[in-house]
């Protein structure tokens, strides 16, 4: 073959026109600890810090690279392609520690790859002359260095280590077909023949232990996972549950073996590999176990939810039971007898109500009886890497169902569907096709699995059906071919082929790159070794390739073309058509020199039929396709604004067909669209694969650590192409990214701050900190301004300073809307919606996969993703790896509709991801807002005052399922309660309660005296309605359930309440407060004031004998012992009248039984702040409680309790540990939500622990360290 030079010149270095720079690569954990560091490395100047980090961390060889090398002469190889080995003699002159080391120059990596490909290409007779080989090597090195193209990760890891450095090792059980003899050979060297393939499809037979069977598959998968590759298999040959075995028994079924494979993959992943095992499981829709398979992940997610919730409920009750036993002072084992220990009896009842197993309750009591003081019961969370997810199955694979057209047509026609036995084809079960379709849609909605393979469409485009059908794919579903074959990937960065002057794709450069990289991937098949003999043989016979592209989203946005537009789809289709057409033409050209792939002859007619169908689609034909069940979406020439692309697309397919008819093809497949996760970062791609962009503001990594905000580089270029002036572009960018200072900000600026007492020095300090801030609230704090200034000038108290939720701007009197307006000005909106000068008709150009920023509303529709895939699919040999993002409020029906549209538009596969469908993913706040409650309040205000009480009562009555009619219960004329003052979203709220004689709540008053008359009247009538309901027996729990989490203004931060720190409305705040105080609902508090820890102070057997009281007025006070010299306490004295030093945040409180009918002797009156919710049985227990409360405690108990209290409170280790854990969790959640606002998924990277994960095909990748679960 003749190789043209387009980027380099003969006799000149590949890098002559490329500037390089010194760099330091460092990746840190969020806590600042260094994960990886490599200093003084050389990289191309255009490489970003992220690209530098990925190259240095993942692709530089870290050890075994000799400092001094020598060439190994080969007579039949040009000298510039001679391989190198360590110069042992020269190395002996160096200190031993300096003889071997790491690659430190990007040129070492580029030369290692390009040189190895040229070396094997020469040996395989791919080049006509030495100059062609030299041009091939130089052009490839140049394209790697300029980020035009990148191969998949295994090429970077393995290729060239033997050729460039002489690195070698014993064989690892791999095989290869000798390219010169055609004989299958077992590898003796680990590196001479590298493993460059990322994607594998493996067969599995219905055999337990023999080669090619079930257990053998786990071994073959393990070998692939160990080296970072992914694999997929169709398990439909395995018999269903209950099918007969040859030995006379019955099969345990498909699912039992899938769970074994899942465990094996998970163990390998956790055994030290750099990323999760990438695995695809496929099952045909007519398999007898298909229903269980579809529900597999749904059920496992439910198990996780049960583990997480159940573990916390059980732990709570078991600790309470243990505490009731330990804090008891009775004799003769009475503490462990619920009949004699009322506190224990109460806790057992509460545990039984929450379904805690009785044998575990008994076990804890026995444990306490043996002298133990505390119990450890492990709780779980929904983190992806937590033990809860590790405990359940099905978490280590992507699951897909393979559907044929007859099933989909049965769904359309509401027909029946048969599930058939694997051996004899007997019908095992018949069900409605729509029922199975509903199950698939629900599972995708609930757990993001399964994806779908449209099997008929896959096989209609199959180039080699003589050997059998396509049954499976790799984990990301872009490579679809015969079982036991492999594919190595490479992707072109489309944006790098855009001409800076013409603003169009340089088609000649693009076609040149496609041609050369088709040769690279073909040579890679020749030089490769494979993990099994079957894959080695079949890969040699079919020689499938995986050339693709990335950055179509970035290209379209930078060109001012919406992703969701006919023009955008036409350009994507034309570029895809050129790529595959030129690649097949190159394959035919190689076949003319070296012969077609060995299995071409029996598949000639089918392959040429497929090529003709590709050509018809490129020519824009809507009819005349051969052997297709569903016609593709043809290229619409008129929609493409660059007609040169159309001309080259049609010419490429004309040539591909012409040369193929003449020579055949060297490769059965040549192209796919892969996720391009890690390699996309190396190429600094804005978008991966065929994906749109995910954010308009990016966070660029700095060499010394940290990030700074920059506008997506496609935005200014797009605005220029749309005709905006430079000054307008600057304003639009500043709106998105922020101005970085308060100088011209609305409401909060130097003038208004000076009026509040700020000096020029303090304003300058604020402006300096704002340059890198994500939110202005994070800058107005004691670390920026100094504690002395805050306390002295701004009158901030020590308590406020220590409050993590304290908002200084709120304290200074700035309104929420003013803070938000200033925040947008300073830190940016992170969206272009609302930007100055930007026309509404241009907003679509900047639509992303998700809403951008806090105020962004626009995002690409589900249909836009599917139609973009459909525009490219007719020009791809394989398929497209892509996951369709769906909003959280998408329905099961929406999922089914998306899948049905995918089939009708002739896609080969698709997968869905509904936001929040995984427990491990936090919900995006913007997706869970509910305006219904705000609408309800607005409608309420419009009503007459008399009607308002009726409406509110009706809302409550809807919540009460059944209640026995009863008379109104009157409150005492002189009644107890408490007053709680707080500020909610800047508005003062006074909540007062009135209690029945036994401590139950009977009325509330809500006073917001500075609000308008209408709002005050509404709140007053609301409180009356609630009070009437309470007096007529409506349980407080029903009000709590109805009104917590309601959302309307005023809302926001809560100050002055020790348990509640944030509320979504006044009603939310009021009923959270009442729930915590009267129901013990500490799950509704933000600061847990309960006392379940082992340092909490109780009163033994008296624990359950004190009258039920509100804890609203006692919350936050230290335990107080009433000494005997304080005298008797009158029954009429109000609760809480004892002097107690306030200690905000303390979990232990004191309450007094002050309403007894007679005076009590001085007692230890120490109880927990927990109040048991008696719900509807409190009347039955009133007499029992009245009798219990009259019992006395002797003086010895007073002294002993005083000693116990002193001892318990002297050790704060447990409390400190709990506080630290809570604070760490709070910070993690803050970082998680901040990452969501920045456009990331909110999940944490398992390698570097940063919250910088973005969706990448069916998986995710980390923008910080490049970790990915995909194949690239």
Swiss-Prot record:
5'-deoxyadenosylcobalamine (coenzyme B12). Coiled coil: none annotated. One of its GO terms (molecular function) is nucleotide binding. Its cofactor is adenosylcob(III)alamin. The active site is at residues 474, 476, 478. Disulfide bonds join 199-487. Substrate binds at residues 153, 198-199, 230, 474-478, 675-679. InterPro entries: RdRp_reductase_class-2, RNR_2_N, RNR_lg_C, RNR_NrdJ/NrdZ, TSCPD_dom, YebC-like. It comes from the Bacteria. The keyword Repeat does not apply. The keyword Oxidoreductase applies. Keywords: Cobalamin, Cobalt, Disulfide bond, DNA synthesis, Nucleotide-binding, Oxidoreductase. Residues 1120-1147 are annotated as: Disordered. It catalyses: a 2'-deoxyribonucleoside 5'-diphosphate + [thioredoxin]-disulfide + H2O = a ribonucleoside 5'-diphosphate + [thioredoxin]-dithiol. One of its GO terms (biological process) is DNA biosynthetic process. Its EC number is 1.17.4.1. NCBIfam families: NrdJ_Z, PRK07562.1. Catalyzes the reduction of ribonucleotides to deoxyribonucleotides. May function to provide a pool of deoxyribonucleotide precursors for DNA repair during oxygen limitation and/or for immediate growth after restoration of oxygen. Belongs to the ribonucleoside diphosphate reductase class-2 family. This is Vitamin B12-dependent ribonucleotide reductase. It comes from Agrobacterium fabrum (strain C58 / ATCC 33970).
